[in-house]
Amino acid sequence: PGSCTVYMARRSLLFSPADRPELMRKGPDSGADIIASDLEDAVAPAHKATAREGLVTLLSDPDFDPDCEVCVRVNSDPDVAEMDLKALLGAEKPVRLDSIMLPKAETAADIDQLVTAISEYNTERPILAICESAAGVLHAQEIAAHDAVDCLLFGAEDLSADIGAKRTES
């Protein structure tokens, strides 16, 4: 009696640029626990609309049903993220989208803003928040404590740039 929730381990994450949906289609073959299509840094501004269209085509394909978590990294700019969400969650056909990644999360208010935007489509998705700035690191505990946040990630490259650190090879 009762119910049991089974959680998949998140040991590995494979990113692919959203303007290359064929790479995401191959992602499950990598054995990664999460495959994430990146609409933010990996796609030039001039290609974002086309990237969204191709991504929605892939994620609404009934033949695309991998045995791993399917995530999309939306844009950090709220206006551009809204266009991402409209394409994904407002699509004519249902899309395979298990979670949404929020880059450059700096406070719990950033999470609130994304949750509100997602709720406009009468749905919920777990949020994978990326702390990529000094402010994000300072507020990591409040970000991680947000009910909608399922996972907290650390973005070393953008953090290094934010604090003016010089990356060195080891």
Regions found by a protein language model. Give the residues of each.
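Conserved alpha/beta-domain cores
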Residues: 6-170
